[in-house]
Amino acid sequence: MSAENILKVPFSKPSISEEEEKAVIEVIRSGWLTTGKVTLEFEKEFSDFMNSTLDDEKQQVISLAVNSNTSGMILAMNACGVKEGTAIITTPYTFVSTAACAKHLGADVIFCDVEKDSYNIDADKIEQILIENEKTHKADIKAIVPVHIAGNVCNMKKIMMLAKKYNLKVIEDAAHSFPSKTDMGYAGTIGDIGVFSFYATKPLTTGEGGMVCTKDPELAKTMQVMRMHGMDRTTWDRYTSPKASWQYDIVAPGFKFNLPDILSAIGRVQLKKTNDFFEKRKHIAALYNNGFKDVDFVQIPPDSDGNAWHLYLMRLNLEKLKIDRDEFSRQLQQNGIGVSMHFIPLFHFSYWQNLDADFTKENFPNAENQFIRTITLPLWPDMTDEMAYDTINAVIKIGSENHAC
């Protein structure tokens, strides 16, 4: 990249300070690097945060740290009975891991289009799928897997009602939605299980990692055992209790999905900054919304109760432009603005196309319409107002130069 093309506004940068560095060094010097005391403390503190909106002491959130959202989704689906001969319902407008986790377990995926005016799965269309399946008994559906795209929370009231009616589990893919506080509690605590991501670009990061939350002790127990090889004892217990470390049982063919203390140390510091990070994200989003409110070729992103503003999904009114989304993105990058695209619908990928001839953009028009219009703009806590204004000005400049009228 030449000097003139260096990005003035990076798409994303993690907000890491000396506090996180000191926490990591402390773990390194402790002599215990893998999953142990620090991870247990991180899990407790995360649970305390999520429980802060709950009144029922009998329905408290249990948190289990994992090495990625993907790992957490596999644990969650496995605990909910997703396996060969069963199916889940989810959206094609998501990162591939949401659906791939079901395939790893041998299950089928029934895709449901998104709402016309948002990026989230359409609860009314979920209902249509369930009504039809009740007639045909074509699939043994075990779970609905809503994805809170960009931190904008799905219609959980309707989804939970459907789950109760059809005796299904709800597994929230909450990779984008921390902290999304709603009148039903935090996103990720509304369904049977919620799975968060702590990837480098997420609102809370550990570099790589995630957290699984549930209020069901039995589900928690199953996931805890499966998280670490199916052992009936944790690593910390094996090496800190009087009982010999080699005395354990393997009760199931588990996975290796644990989060080490080094990464949990970062997470504990980040968790303390959650509210500050959220306010900064909300501030940048408000600057964008205000800057684009009178721009006819830009549509402001949907905003729900509890929006975490993980991403700012700018939708282009292509009818007002002479260029398409890809060219608009290219020109933004030429102007020094880092951009991305969330997400490429899964029906554009060869693996998923080859599984089902009917899995096409024509059968998921809302997802396709959002895809061809959307550009993800920079949004991160340490962004300055100047960076936001540079982004707004670049969008307006490019749109004005390429206006159709």
Predicted regions span which residues?
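Active-site PLP attachment segment
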Residues: T189-R233, D261
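Phosphate-binding glycine-rich loop
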Residues: W32-A87, C101-K103, F111, T136
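PLP-dependent aminotransferase class I/II
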Residues: T39-E45, N51-S52, D56-V61, D113, ...
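Structural detector of well-ordered beta-strand residues that form the stable sheet scaffold
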Residues: I89, I110, V170-I171, V195, ...
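N-terminal "arm"/small-domain region of PLP-dependent enzymes with the aminotransferase-like
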Residues: M1-L33, K37, Y248-V251, P378
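PLP-dependent aminotransferase-like
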Residues: N78-K165, K169-A174, K181
